[in-house]
């Protein structure tokens, strides 16, 4: 019998998945031996019992059995160990007031415990560390669990919020596209109709353009408002508010990147740039991440970046 056939057969009752397609395999974190669901019900329904695998003396309970997620049992074991350890050692960098060195040391100690438990090294010692830490830090562990739960809820709300906004954006973009297509057709016919009664072609075209400009719906304005809402995502601000205080800026050799006080202010409302505004409405540009503020920021940064650099002074020998 090859390995593939063994994977689909219960080693206890020898039932094959081919004959029982609905058969489920379960494992117990005590020993991670694979047993089918029927054998678990049959052997452990009356209470704790010894693992039916030959040579395994672990006492197993029915309520501890779970569905195996990973095909590799070693991976399954490590994931379970990490989950158990991280539920106790659940500090974040916020608990260290932004001290990355202390936080890294803490993570290293946690990884040592995980490695020891996963590889059977000083298991009793590592279990004692885990138990002692849990007893001494119950309040902190519960507080961090509540905070992590809140962070997850904020993340899910943010995902839902962004999904709804993006759906509305797609609907508005489709509406704008349909209106523009209809306007183009209308312009062609309107120019032809007006030229039948007027000889001034330039005036006719100018009048039609003005009419089209007035006919532009509120969909475009709504789309711009949605883009502003996405840029000023309230959930993003909440989740990142505390981390911004501890933001670490990496070193770069470019001149001007340490100037935190910008010498310019971007006012998109009063600055009219028809080229960039038109690009903002095109799907291929939006899909690639194009934003008007990125363009303005880059151009103005390049313009102001070298103001503090005197070339002659830089060229002088030190």
Swiss-Prot record:
Pfam families attached to this UniProt entry: MAT1, zf-C3HC4_5
GO BP terms in the entry: DNA repair; nucleotide-excision repair; regulation of transcription by RNA polymerase II; transcription initiation at RNA polymerase II promoter
Subcellular location: Nucleus
Broad class of where this protein is predominantly found: nucleus
ZnF locations on chain (RING-type): 10-55
InterPro entries assigned to the protein according to its UniProt record, in alphabetical order: Cdk-activating_kinase_MAT1_cen, MAT1/Tfb3, Znf_RING, Znf_RING/FYVE/PHD, Znf_RING_CS
Function: Acts as a component of the general transcription and DNA repair factor IIH (TFIIH or factor B), which is essential for both basal and activated transcription, and is involved in nucleotide excision repair (NER) of damaged DNA. TFIIH as CTD kinase activity and DNA-dependent ATPase activity, and is essential for polymerase II transcription.
Protein name according to UniProt: RNA polymerase II transcription factor B subunit 3
Annotated source species: Eremothecium gossypii (strain ATCC 10895 / CBS 109.51 / FGSC 9923 / NRRL Y-1056) (Yeast)
